[in-house]
From Swiss-Prot:
Positions contributing to substrate binding: 12-17
SUPFAM superfamilies documented for this protein: P-loop containing nucleoside triphosphate hydrolases (SSF52540)
Family: Belongs to the IPP transferase family.
Protein origin, superkingdom: Bacteria
Residues reported to bind ATP: 10-17
Segments of this protein annotated with the region Interaction with substrate tRNA: 35-38
Function recorded in the entry: Catalyzes the transfer of a dimethylallyl group onto the adenine at position 37 in tRNAs that read codons beginning with uridine, leading to the formation of N6-(dimethylallyl)adenosine (i(6)A).
The species this protein was found in: Dictyoglomus turgidum (strain DSM 6724 / Z-1310)
Transmembrane helix recorded as keyword: no
Protein name: tRNA dimethylallyltransferase
Taxonomic placement: Bacteria, Pseudomonadati, Dictyoglomota, Dictyoglomia, Dictyoglomales
Entry keyword annotation includes tRNA processing: yes
Transmembrane segments: none
Length: 326
């Protein structure tokens, strides 16, 4: 059975959450978060989670599902997301995937499989110590020797992914590129919606977004996590905003320096998101600065329905209550 679903993706700060809630007025949907940071409990401000009020209006999934000290793998995301998608459709509603974590989309839609190798915390600690002593490029060069294909897809300074690739190799004796071979699947009718805006406007919104997070209490949020033992050794604390505020709390940066660093890294991250998403040719891109929210929701609604119908899904009654192929 093929399941019709829609995706709202795009870089941080483009209004994905607002659009998803507005779209819910036109389609009977439940929202599946595709965000690698919103999975963590107690990390609300820095991850820009939908409010509890919004989550009561429209059911949301894969938010607040693990504690910040838990190492959540991409393989786990795929397993949980597929289960949730099937459950949503069984309730006669449509899954609406919303978020900006490119790797999650890639593994969910079967572009490659991820080996389910449990994390080795001791191995990671040793690798981080080696990187601190001899530099990140030392580990990157090692990865290039054992798995050049994977290395070519990872930035030389992306220490987390470099260590993970090395970890998989030393655990199972095979490079991750060999284990994660292409495995395309055809289990969904998919409509992909991408959001963007002019760069100057986007950067201004990103800066305002960071300032708002500080006003909402991001410093206290990070302080509470740190007091519970959550530090930079945990994946959850690698999110932009958290590690910079942690440095402020330790006296390594002033608050102004940490805020400026958050803004700088957020803009850099957005550039990488654009680069990744632009590789895909089957995304319908919308400049959000050109429409009101209601106008955009109507355009996106029609685009989704047309995509589904072009792929063979019979969307029966746009005005009625029966949207399913009964």
């Amino acid at each position: 059975m093929k399941i019709p679903l829609a995706v709202i993706l795009g870089p941080t700060g483009t209004g994905k959450t607002k659009l998803s809630l507005e779209l819910a007025k036109y389609l009977p949907v439940e929202i599946v978060s595709v965000d690698s940071m919103q999975i963590y409990q107690g990390m609300d401000i820095g991850t820009a989670k939908p409010s509890l009020e919004d989550r009561e209006k429209v059911p949301h999934h894969l938010i607040d599902i693990v504690l910040p000290d838990y190492f959540f793998t991409v393989a786990e995301f795929r397993e949980r997301a597929l289960k949730v998608i099937e459950e949503i459709y069984a309730r006669r509603r449509f899954p609406l995937l919303v978020g900006g974590t490119p790797l999650y989309y890639k593994v969910l839609f079967g572009e490659f499989s991820i080996p389910h190798v449990p994390p080795d915390l001791e191995f990671r600690r040793k690798m981080k110590e080696l990187a601190e002593k001899e530099g990140e490029y030392k580990l990157y060069e090692e990865l290039k020797k054992i798995d050049p294909k994977t290395a070519s897809k990872i930035h030389p300074r992306d220490l987390k992914r470099i260590i993970r690739a090395l970890e998989v190799y030393y655990k199972v004796g095979k490079p991750i590129s060999e284990l994660a071979g292409e495995k395309k699947e055809d289990r969904f009718y998919i409509s992909k919606i991408g959001l963007y805006m002019p760069r100057d406007l986007h950067y201004r919104i990103l800066e305002e977004r960071v300032d708002k997070m500080i006003e909402q209490g991001l410093v206290d949020e990070v302080r509470n996590l740190y007091l519970k033992g959550i530090n930079e050794n945990f994946v959850s604390m690698q999110g932009i905003g958290y590690k910079e505020i942690l440095r402020y709390l330790r006296g390594e940066l002033t608050l102004e320096e940490s805020i400026n660093l958050i803004k700088k890294r957020t803009k850099e991250f957005v550039k990488r998101q654009y680069t990744w998403f632009k590789k895909y040719k089957d995304i319908h891109w919308f400049d959000v600065s050109q429409y009101s929210l209601s106008q955009l929701a109507k355009l996106v609604y029609n685009t989704i329905i047309n995509d589904w119908e072009n792929q063979g899904y019979k969307y029966q009654n746009r005005e009625g209550v029966n949207y399913f192929n009964d």
